[in-house]
């Protein structure tokens, strides 16, 4: 028996409103708990799959800027 964490997270967050997604992200960031990282990764993956090239470029630039401050 194998457990697919990505699918479990998607099943848990599917159908979430914009406000619920934001609350999930804020909660994960404020709690600082490492157990929240896979969920943030799945949310990032969803964003990436739906973003156009300019959105991806902008996001990567912002992340890079934040990593180099």
UniProtKB/Swiss-Prot annotation:
It is found in: Spore core. InterPro entries: SspI. The keyword Nucleotide-binding does not apply. GO terms for biological process: asexual sporulation; sporulation resulting in formation of a cellular spore. Transmembrane segments: none annotated. Belongs to the SspI family. This is Small, acid-soluble spore protein I. The gene is sspI.
């Amino acid at each position: 028996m194998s457990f697919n964490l990505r699918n479990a997270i998607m099943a848990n967050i599917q159908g979430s409103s914009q406000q619920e997604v934001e609350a999930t992200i804020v909660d994960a960031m404020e709690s600082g708990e490492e157990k929240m990282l896979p969920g943030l990764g799945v949310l990032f993956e969803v964003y990436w799959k739906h973003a156009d090239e300019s959105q991806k470029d902008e996001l990567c630039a912002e992340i890079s800027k934040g990593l180099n401050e």
